[in-house]
């Protein structure tokens, strides 16, 4: 089968020798694009349209070897010439750029289709429900959309974590999402034409109109390889210190401020504990200041960006993984912690609400600010006092990760969706 994949975000995993640009480009969604394309090409002839910024990383990874299947993929790189680099990290300009990039991608796809005659088109990334795929809306071939997200929002109770400018940014985001869902005809055509709509969390599922709900399939935006799995046995560290780990880009919406405040409440009762934060980003200075103000700077350890294999080693040694991100569509680090047999504490919203279930973790409903802090602290206390519970949740988390998130399993599920899409209606 000849498959056309639109993957605006597609970048190989970062390595120890990677540049700062590689670290920024190889985020969760870009890894999703790279990994799932590797699964699709195992069974099909694949053409991929992606942005030109990805070219260097993709070609370097293919030259290094170890990606033999992906060498069969025909990559096409497109971008607007002369787009200023300074605008890449600007949310507003990126929304406009991505919208018009989709138009470029459609015209390139139409040209390719006249030559190749595709059997199926798949919009893989970016993963949001409110921005249309022009390939999906207008290219005359069966179409798969997703996995998409974007249905999640910042809980009102936690908006006080934002600065005033971040609150304005959040309102801007909600406004453009409303316009996308209610005004853009091309977005409605995507829903109508799609043979399957893959969604990565429950909130996004609920954004799909009732008449198209029969097309919806829950499908994660995070995946695991066999080497990501740690030992199944959960052990306390030899030094007897209860270790809480959290990982991610240091941005306010990731909830690291909540993690520090909840840990401060917990460690007053149980001082033989530490919180380790791995990551870098614009919120680092504020977070370090917060730890000093709460007089726990000696128990909060900050580690800069680390390669994935180093992060997995840290996960293997911790007791609990804490991830109170309050605007998260996916949450790759949650799945990675589960693979390392760690119980996860997170918020009942977005991707974490999908990943974490009572059988293998603890979810906190974001009802009010003080309630969130109190319940996060109580969850830490509960897991600190009950080693058997930690072990039971950790083992269940590892089984869930093996059953649901293993990349080969996701490839099998995607192949089934492809086959169903081509069945006569």
Q: Which residues make up each language-model segment?
A:
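Aromatic "clamp/platform" in nucleotide-sugar-dependent glycosyltransferases that forms part
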Residues: 326
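N-terminal subdomain of nucleotide-sugar transferases
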Residues: 1-70
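Short alpha-helical donor nucleotide-sugar binding micro-motif in glycosyltransferases
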Residues: 305-306, 313-318
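Nucleotide-activated donor-binding/catalytic signature segment of Leloir-type glycosyltransferases, i.e.
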Residues: 288-306
């Amino acid at each position: 089968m000849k498959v056309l994949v639109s993957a605006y975000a597609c970048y190989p995993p970062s390595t120890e020798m990677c540049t700062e640009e590689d670290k920024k480009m190889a985020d969760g969604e870009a890894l999703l694009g790279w990994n799932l394309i590797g699964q699709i090409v195992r069974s099909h002839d694949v053409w991929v349209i992606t942005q030109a910024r990805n070219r260097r990383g993709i070609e370097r990874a293919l030259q290094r070897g170890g990606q033999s299947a992906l060498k069969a993929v025909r990559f096409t790189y497109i971008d607007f010439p002369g787009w200023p680099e300074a605008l890449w990290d600007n949310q507003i300009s990126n929304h406009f750029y991505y919208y018009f990039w989709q138009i470029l991608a459609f015209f390139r796809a139409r040209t390719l289709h006249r030559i190749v005659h595709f059997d199926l088109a798949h919009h893989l990334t970016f993963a949001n429900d409110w921005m249309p795929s022009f390939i999906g809306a207008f290219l005359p071939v069966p179409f798969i959309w997703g996995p998409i997200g974007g249905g999640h929002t910042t809980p009102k109770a936690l908006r006080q974590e934002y600065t005033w400018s971040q609150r304005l940014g959040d309102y801007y985001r909600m406004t453009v999402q409303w316009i996308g869902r209610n005004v853009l005809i091309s977005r409605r055509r995507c829903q109508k034409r799609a043979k399957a709509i893959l969604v990565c969390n429950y909130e996004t599922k609920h954004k799909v109109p009732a008449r198209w709900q029969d097309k919806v399939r829950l499908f994660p935006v995070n995946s695991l390889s066999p080497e990501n799995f740690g030992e199944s046995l959960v052990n306390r560290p030899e030094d007897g210190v209860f270790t809480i780990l959290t990982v991610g880009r240091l941005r306010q919406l990731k909830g690291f401020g909540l993690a520090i405040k909840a840990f401060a409440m917990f460690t007053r009762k149980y001082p033989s504990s530490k919180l380790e934060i791995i990551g870098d980003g614009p919120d680092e200075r504020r977070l370090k200041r917060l730890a000093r103000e709460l007089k726990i700077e000696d128990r909060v350890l900050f580690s800069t960006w680390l390669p994935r294999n180093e992060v997995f080693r840290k996960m293997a040694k911790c007791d609990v993984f804490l991830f109170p991100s309050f605007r998260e569509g996916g949450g790759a680090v949650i799945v990675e912690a589960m693979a390392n047999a760690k119980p996860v504490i997170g918020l009942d919203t977005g991707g974490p609400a999908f990943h974490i279930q009572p059988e293998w973790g603890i979810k906190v409903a974001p009802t009010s600010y003080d309630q969130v802090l109190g319940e996060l602290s109580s969850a830490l206390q509960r897991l600190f006092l009950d080693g058997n519970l930690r072990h039971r949740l950790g083992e269940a988390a590892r089984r869930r990760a093996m059953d649901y998130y293993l990349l080969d399993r996701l490839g099998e599920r995607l192949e089934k969706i492809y086959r169903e899409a081509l069945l006569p209606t």
